[in-house]
UniProtKB/Swiss-Prot annotation:
Presence of the UniProt keyword Nucleotide-binding in the record: no
Similarity-based family: Belongs to the universal ribosomal protein uS8 family.
Protein source organism: Drosophila melanogaster
Entry protein name: Small ribosomal subunit protein uS8B
InterPro entries for the chain: Ribosomal_uS8 (IPR000630), Ribosomal_uS8_CS (IPR047863), Ribosomal_uS8_sf (IPR035987)
Amino acid sequence: MVRMNVLADALKCINNAEKRGKRQVLLRPCSKVIIKFLTVMMKHGYIGEFEIVEDHRAGKIVVNLTGRLNKCGVISPRFDAPINDIEKWTNNLLPSRQFGYVVLTTSGGIMDHEEARRKHLGGKILGFFF
């Protein structure tokens, strides 16, 4: 079967494993976008460490789960989010102002909405987690 959206598949696997109470989840294939998204999630403590397993094909990622993640998902298509519209997107996607992050891809790399606001960057919305 052909994978249409690798990031969506990976986040759905993480979501399902978290709901089942698993401690680890195996994601394949590996991509740079998935690694950067997981790095943002790890920086905020929603997942534990993750390890990239190179198998001379597409690669795999083993993610350690902490049980803190409620939901994560992809926004498809990747809508444009100028700096002044990021607030509107966070209100639509996140349950409250206190927690959760919207992940954007900007000219400065993949980052959460707070870092993008600090750096005064807009971009395209990849997904969210809380």
